[in-house]
């Protein structure tokens, strides 16, 4: 057998290589001091740097809202990021602060650095390093402290200073400095 190929005119052959891979971003929401209850709502923000693909369960602004109604923990499922080329992708994950009804929000800012490597077989492998909190996972813990209030803006504060001991007494021009 002697195969021969002949062409009329010029022929171009273009080889393409496409690879893809995914990483699923999850976390946990915790509350201490009480259980979650009907009406609780927590919003989280995912911000990707440069051309980082966003997780598929956040909205167009990178936000995810959950409304747990019981228990002390709730799953956070930000969704899957789909990558089409190797590289390092960095994300910031935060909880929007809305201290209310004695619940104090967690202000931790997590950095999720996803390293995507090409396996040269049409697949990409993605591994994440999570920093910012305690451990290697995204965990936001709110604290319920009845009667606690987060002050924002102006607030009235009444303070009384009592001078005791000795016979010196309070004199005109005396002053004290208080630091809150």
List each language-model region with its residue ranges:
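Solvent-exposed loop/turn and edge beta-strand elements of beta-rich ligand-binding domains
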Residues: 1-180
